[in-house]
């Protein structure tokens, strides 16, 4: 039982900060342990059931944590940490949480030795900066025009996912998509905006049937029930956000019809109104019309479809609001909210728009427009669970390529970087004295959690494998890492490589998170 001690300034509970830190460290390490089995090519998947009953199967750290019912504030910091790694590098979301948990475990040992938390936090921060330097010293600069190297980096990311058996098909496709969507920087490098690459999910077929298309692909179909076209060459594309149906009166108004002549008059007026809309669209030289989905009523009436078909205008309806921006970038069409503003200068263009049927589902494909760098990836799969996880896997691999475009340098995977960091930091700790030496030594030991976890998940003996790795690194084999087939091997020869940015950001962010948690000595709840 903690006893408050009386001082001039009042009563102070000396044990409370220790209990708060212990609680924070336990909660954070519990989160890290929960996803530890998901790391690496032999990592296990998690099945998550959301509050709405939706089932998700994934081994992506960020996805698992985002859906986990986490209550403790310190544990929520690790969820945010994974999200930060996802936004910075896109990959390494599991590694960063495991590293943070390991660093907090090391900090717990140091706290028990009586070292002040501020000293631990400061030394961990310095050690992380030194670790990032060690990783960059190990890195190998690459030429972004070297397609084979980019494919190997994308394959390494895909090999730990559900789509690993299809990585030889998907990796080249992703590299082609990234190079097509990339833009040149003033310095002569490349920059990749993932908003220029759209992943469309379509049920049916297998993952192997996933295809890449330059330009735009819509998971919709051309309306043909009124006899409209499903293929249009030299397309002039209009994008509307208003309804092609008769105007409705306000809720409080009503119309009283006394005889058939008045009814005929109303129907004739509606017919003339809709015909006027169709003629205005045709007058602008539009021959492909995209209509945004409406939650209020049908966005387009059967009569409007009939008139548009007679005018030989291809109609694609129920376009999602989220797709509007990508459609505008791909085709050059500007969204129009009123028929008065629907003019020729608002139209986009492309050489060909056609409806394509594959594996029992229909899509509409737009050929790439000159000057546009957008691409679409059509993901196929047997069920929604597979398709959703495939989409997440492709997104992670694209983020790896984006990281390479930002920092064009590769490092060996398989825990090679972490072992090298542990060796260098461990040596430097022996040249120090005082609390810094102990903190650096514990930091170096904490780094070994990644190779240890990889070995455990691959069914290897972690003690033997990590010891062998340390011996090989001591001999100068800095590229030696864990191979799930051979135990230890040279990672570059195994083509297990990843962007330097993924590793450096994981170590830096994990140390920052550990520092933030160590500096907390109380938890207060607001009213």
UniProtKB/Swiss-Prot annotation:
Signal peptide: none
Subcellular location field: Cytoplasm
Domain of life: Eukaryota
Keyword Cytoplasm on entry: yes
A GO MF term: ATP hydrolysis activity
BP GO annotations: chaperone mediated protein folding independent of cofactor; protein folding
InterPro entries for this protein: Chap_CCT_delta (IPR012717), Chaperone_TCP-1 (IPR017998), Chaperonin_TCP-1_CS (IPR002194), Cpn60/GroEL/TCP-1 (IPR002423), GroEL-like_apical_dom_sf (IPR027409), GROEL-like_equatorial_sf (IPR027413), TCP-1-like_intermed_sf (IPR027410), TCP-1_chaperonin (IPR053374)
Cellular component GO terms, alphabetical: chaperonin-containing T-complex
Keywords: ATP-binding, Chaperone, Cytoplasm, Nucleotide-binding
Sequence similarity: Belongs to the TCP-1 chaperonin family.
Oligomeric and partner information: Heterooligomeric complex of about 850 to 900 kDa that forms two stacked rings, 12 to 16 nm in diameter.
PANTHER family, per the entry: CHAPERONIN
Stored NCBIfam families: chap_CCT_delta (TIGR02342), thermosome_alpha (NF041082), thermosome_beta (NF041083)
Record's function text: Molecular chaperone; assists the folding of proteins upon ATP hydrolysis. Known to play a role, in vitro, in the folding of actin and tubulin.
Record protein name field: T-complex protein 1 subunit delta
Gene expressing this chain: CCT4
């Amino acid at each position: 039982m903690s006893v408050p001690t009386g001082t001039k300034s009042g009563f102070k509970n000396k044990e409370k900060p220790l209990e708060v830190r212990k609680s924070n460290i336990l909660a954070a390490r519990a989160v890290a342990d929960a996803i530890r089995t998901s790391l690496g090519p032999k990592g296990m998947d998690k099945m998550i059931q959301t509050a709405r009953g939706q089932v998700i199967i994934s081994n992506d750290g960020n996805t698992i944590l985002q859906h986990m019912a986490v209550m403790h504030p310190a544990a929520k910091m690790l969820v945010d940490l994974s999200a930060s790694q996802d936004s910075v590098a896109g990959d390494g979301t599991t590694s960063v949480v495991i590293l943070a948990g390991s660093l907090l475990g090391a900090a717990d040992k140091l706290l028990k030795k009586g070292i002040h938390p501020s000293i631990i936090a400061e030394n961990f921060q310095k050690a992380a900066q030194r670790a990032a330097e060690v990783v960059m010293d190990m890195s190998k600069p690459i030429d972004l025009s070297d397609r084979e190297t980019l494919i190997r980096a994308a394959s390494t990311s895909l090999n730990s996912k559900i789509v690993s058996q299809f990585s030889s098909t998907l990796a080249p496709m992703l590299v082609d998509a990234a190079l097509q969507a990339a833009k040149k920087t003033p310095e002569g490098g490349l920059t990749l905006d993932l908003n220029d690459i759209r992943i469309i999910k379509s049920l049916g077929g297998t993952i192997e049937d996933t295809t890449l298309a330059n330009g735009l692909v819509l998971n919709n179909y051309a309306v043909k029930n009124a006899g409209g076209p499903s293929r249009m060459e030299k397309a002039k594309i209009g994008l509307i956000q208003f309804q092609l149906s008769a105007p409705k009166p306000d809720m409080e108004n009503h119309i009283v019809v006394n005889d058939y002549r008045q009814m005929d008059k109303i129907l004739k007026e509606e017919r003339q109104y809709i015909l006027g809309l169709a003629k205005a669209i045709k007058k602008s030289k539009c021959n492909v019309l995209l209509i945004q989905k409406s939650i209020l009523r049908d966005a387009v009436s059967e009569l409007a479809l009939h008139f548009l078909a007679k005018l030989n205008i291809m109609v694609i309806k129920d376009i999602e609001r989220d797709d509007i921006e990508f459609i505008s970038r791909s085709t050059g069409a500007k969204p129009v909210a009123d028929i008065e503003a629907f003019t020729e200068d608002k139209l986009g263009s492309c050489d060909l728009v056609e409806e394509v049927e594959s594996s029992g589902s229909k899509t509409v494909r737009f050929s790439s427009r000159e000057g546009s760098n957008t691409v679409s990836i059509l993901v196929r799969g047997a069920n929604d669970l597979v398709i959703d996880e495939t989409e997440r896997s492709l997104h992670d691999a694209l983020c790896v390529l984006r990281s390479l475009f930002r920092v064009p340098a590769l490092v060996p995977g398989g825990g090679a970087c972490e072992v090298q960091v542990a060796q260098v930091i461990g040596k430097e700790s022996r040249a120090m004295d005082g609390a810094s030496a102990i903190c650096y030594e514990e930091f170096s030991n904490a780094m070994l959690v990644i190779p240890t976890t990889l070995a455990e998940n691959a069914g290897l003996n972690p003690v033997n494998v990590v010891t062998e790795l340390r011996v090989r690194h001591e001999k100068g084999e800095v590229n030696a890492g864990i191979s799930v087939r051979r135990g230890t091997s040279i990672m570059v020869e195994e083509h297990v490589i990843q962007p330097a940015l993924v590793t450096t950001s994981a170590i830096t962010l994990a140390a920052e998170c550990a520092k933030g948690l160590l500096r907390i000595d109380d938890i207060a709840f607001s009213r």
